[in-house]
Amino acid sequence: MQPIPDVNQRIARISAHLHPPKYQMEESSVLRRANCRAKGGAPGFKVAILGAAGGIGQPLAMLMKMNPLVSVLHLYDVVNAPGVTADISHMDTGAVVRGFLGQQQLERALTGMDLVVIPAGVPRKPGMTRDDLFKINAGIVKTLCEGIAKCCPTAIVNLISNPVNSTVPIAAEVFKKAGTYDPKRLLGVTMLDVVRANTFVAEVLGLDPRDVNVPVVGGHAGVTILPLLSQVKPPSSFTQEEINYLTDRIQNGGTEVVEAKAGAGSATLSMAYAAVKFADACLRGLRGDAGVVECAFVSSQVTELPFFATKVRLGRNGIDEVYSLGPLNEYERIGLEKAKKELAGSIEKGVSFIRG
């Protein structure tokens, strides 16, 4: 017969498994560190996702947890962060996951981060104009960037929150006010335009999308999205009908998804995929890998506009080089002028939001 204390201890252990305590955000971590033998995952980079419980944030967080370059993954949101954190933390990959809930935990979420990815904000819905989107998301981006300026001013920032053509200038102005602005470290994520372009062009050419690369320049909305089909790799020729079709579909890919979801959301899954693809490129650049080149909306002197999406080479300091547009055909030159006209107003709108 077992001693009474041993029996009681055994019952307590079984009861703890059958009735686990309600999950709480303790010390901004899934587990108290004192209860864990391991203090961290494999060597790698510290990444924060701001807006991790949203439609983009959740699949983005899951995919980032799978990235072997990530050692610590901080998930921040104003709602539902505990549940997302608990769920993703059960994945048997190297990154240690910690969750942060609400404005009061933003600073802890950001401290010491190497890369900050921002999908926070409201999604686009049918009938919603870019102005509607701007009014809500501009304030969110401002608040989050103020936290970055204070807690991790040297982090690379990947900004997804729309409208990117305006939110990137907002972020730049916030960082300038704080005295922490480094144009090499602020990148608007336009990778979804490239991903769509690769997919749609591959369909027309009958190729595997993974073997296709289409530079997409300009901005990240409507006519500001300019696919350079004359520079497609592998080199390809298109009829004018194909050029018109591809350009229109790439520019309106977001609307295609919004309408297909019929009010149930926007492009969340493909956006998360594109965001992780771009974040991985940034991490490979930070690691020192050579030849990491992607398109992004960045501070630029390629045109007369202060921001523009072009190919950039990524390195240990963020952007190592911003590439020129290269040779354009007549169709692309006309598209470029349309893009610049639209883009100028969007950039000014973002700047004015901070400067007043």
Swiss-Prot record:
- GO CC terms: glyoxysome
User: Which controlled-vocabulary keywords does the entry list?
Assistant: Glyoxylate bypass, Glyoxysome, NAD, Oxidoreductase, Peroxisome, Transit peptide, Tricarboxylic acid cycle
Does the entry feature the keyword Lipid metabolism, yes or no?
Answer: no
Q: Which residues of this protein are catalytic?
A: 220 (proton acceptor)
The record's section on Pfam families has: Ldh_1_C, Ldh_1_N
Q: Which reaction does it catalyse?
A: (S)-malate + NAD(+) = oxaloacetate + NADH + H(+)
**What's the protein name?**
Malate dehydrogenase, glyoxysomal
Fill in the transit peptide range: 1-36
Provenance organism: Cucumis sativus
